[in-house]
Amino acid sequence: KDASRSVVVVIDVLRATSTIVTALASGCEEVIPAESIEEAIALANGYKRSDYVLGGERRGVPVEGFDLGNSPQEYDGPRVAGKKIIIATTNGTNAITEYGVARDIFVACFLNADAVMEACRAYKDSDFVLVCSGQDGRFCMEDTLCAGLLATRLAEETGAEMSDAARVASLLYQQRKESIEDELLRCDHGAYLVGIGYEQDVR
């Protein structure tokens, strides 16, 4: 698809898009995604220190010297209210910046699926591209399940036609929708996060 004519929805359930959604719900001024740690630092240097919070991770671990990591729990509260959030993550922020030419771009997770659908319903003349950020370039269960939820609803509510990949994601979601939390805990990335102490981000 030509991304410049499409509405792109980037999904990184564990954890970038969940973190971004949480930060916005907590009243941050804006979220600025960065492709790399170096770019995040360069972006931060363009603002007064009191105006931003610098967040990021590599391999799930907070970046040394940054204010916050990539746990949604860290962005739920007054620390981010009124601040610019500059964030660089292993998977999600790269996917967001890659599709910057899109007609419009949204970030999605299970937390904001209803809001994303409400926004998408205004674009009935557009193609929708669901981007699963994955894990280090690999397939991941959690993003595919969320994509399946959105693909199902887009087909039902906007009449969008599914690609084969979207259809597979939809079928997977239909099969597993009653056990999403269990699937998140069992999937590769979820299990990895639990193993390094971030079980609260998975549940």
Please provide the spans of the model-predicted regions.
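Fold-independent oxyanion-binding glycine-rich loops
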Residues: 11-14, 34-37, 56-59, 66-71, ...
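Extended, compositionally biased flexible segments
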Residues: 41-45, 49-75
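Structural motif
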Residues: 6-9, 29-31, 51-54, 83-86, ...
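A short alpha/beta connector and helix-capping loop motif
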Residues: 19-38, 48-53, 58
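Gly/His-enriched, cation/cofactor- and phosphate-binding structural elements
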Residues: 130, 140-141
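Short acidic, Gly/Ser-rich segments with clustered Asp/Glu that frequently serve as metal-coordination loops
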Residues: 1, 8-20
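Long, charged alpha-helical interface segments
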Residues: 65-94, 98-104, 118, 124, ...
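Glycine-rich anion-binding loop/nest that anchors nucleotide
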Residues: 129-135, 158-161
